[in-house]
């Protein structure tokens, strides 16, 4: 995913914290515009990864998530199977849920349906908004 424009007029590109960390550790960072681009796929294959990790990303083509021998897992901001797909935090707050969480699971053909590896729970207070729940999940997911 390309760096995001920030600032008053969006004229400055800022690397994500994940990219900054990877670069500080000398890890390769791939940022394709198209996930089916053959140059990107060749570069990804050349890494010979045993495992891939995806966080908060769009649907990956099977050729990408099926590449590592151990598979690819994802961190999703809900207690799957509840709130599969987009905006799970928003739906938990809109629906007045008292609890949400994060699920780590292996990617498969259908969105957010793979084998669950782990789930962590996070209470939602009556006064919590989407931003508070988001921040709580991000802190929990990073730990």
Residue ranges and their predicted role:
Residues 1-143:
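One-carbon transfer enzymes
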């Amino acid at each position: 995913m390309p760096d995001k424009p920030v600032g008053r007029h969006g004229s400055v590109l800022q690397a994500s914290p994940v990219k900054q960390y990877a670069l500080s550790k000398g890890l390769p960072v791939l940022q394709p515009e198209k996930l089916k681009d053959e140059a990107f796929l060749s570069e990804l294959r050349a890494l010979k990864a045993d495992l891939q990790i995806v966080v908060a990303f769009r649907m990956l083509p099977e050729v990408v998530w099926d590449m590592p021998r151990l598979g690819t897992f994802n961190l999703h901001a809900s207690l799957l199977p509840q709130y599969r797909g987009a905006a799970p935090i928003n739906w938990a707050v809109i629906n007045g849920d008292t609890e949400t969480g994060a699920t780590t699971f292996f990617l498969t053909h259908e969105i957010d349906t793979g084998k669950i590896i782990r789930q962590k729970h996070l209470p939602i207070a009556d006064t919590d908004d989407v931003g508070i729940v988001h921040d709580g999940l991000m802190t929990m997911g990073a730990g």
